[in-house]
Regions:
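Beta-strand-rich interaction surfaces with strong enrichment in secreted/lumenal proteins
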Residues: 5-8, 69-75, 105-107
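Aromatic sugar-binding interfaces of carbohydrate-active proteins
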Residues: 151
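Extracellular glycan-recognition modules
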Residues: 1-58, 77, 91-92, 123-127, ...
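Flexible glycan-contacting loops in extracellular carbohydrate-active proteins
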Residues: 104-132
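Localized edge beta-strand/strand-to-loop motifs within extracellular or lumenal beta-rich domains
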Residues: 79-93
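Short, aromatic/His-centered strand-loop micro-motif at the edge of beta-sheets
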Residues: 57-82
């Protein structure tokens, strides 16, 4: 749990980019890698997930349509995953290992956050059982570029 808040520049429907390198030997249904918001309200959530839930197993906004999962997530057990999420204020694109797995036109309502959490969500549930090599969050849209680092 952090002692700092989400940057003030990430509010409402503001652009952001998230990048992470994850290794998870056994991926459960819902595992929160990082919850960037302490909110519990619909569309106010920015949570990076590493789970098998096909509806929200990669990115959770506490929406329904706005969330994103990956039906083939279980095939990534024991393999490094390069996860890249970029949102320009309208379109959210999600890539795993250079593959576009989701691209949606969404509307978010991100509010000021009291803290950020690694390894579980703001409700202190959905524990992450894997390894996190790096995690980056930008308050701007950075289009995805192929990494050439994925086997």
């Amino acid at each position: 749990r952090s002692n700092f808040m989400l940057p003030a520049t990430i509010r409402d429907n503001a652009p952001y980019t998230i990048e992470a390198w994850i290794l998870n030997p056994e991926i459960a249904e819902n595992e929160s890698v990082a919850d960037f918001t302490s909110s519990h309200n619909e569309l106010e959530k920015l949570m990076l997930v590493n789970g098998t839930e096909p509806r929200c197993g990669v990115m959770n906004h506490y929406g329904w349509y706005e969330d994103a999962g990956y039906k083939e997530m279980k095939t990534l057990e024991g393999k490094w995953q390069h996860v890249y999420v970029c949102f320009d204020g309208r379109i959210e694109s999600i890539y795993i290992n250079d593959k576009l797995i989701s691209q949606k036109d969404i509307q978010l309502l991100v509010k000021p956050s009291q803290f950020m959490l690694l390894g579980k969500n703001a409700e202190e549930a959905w524990p992450f059982s894997g390894y996190l090599h790096s995690l980056k969050l930008w308050d701007e849209y950075i289009p995805y570029k192929k990494t050439n680092k994925i086997n």
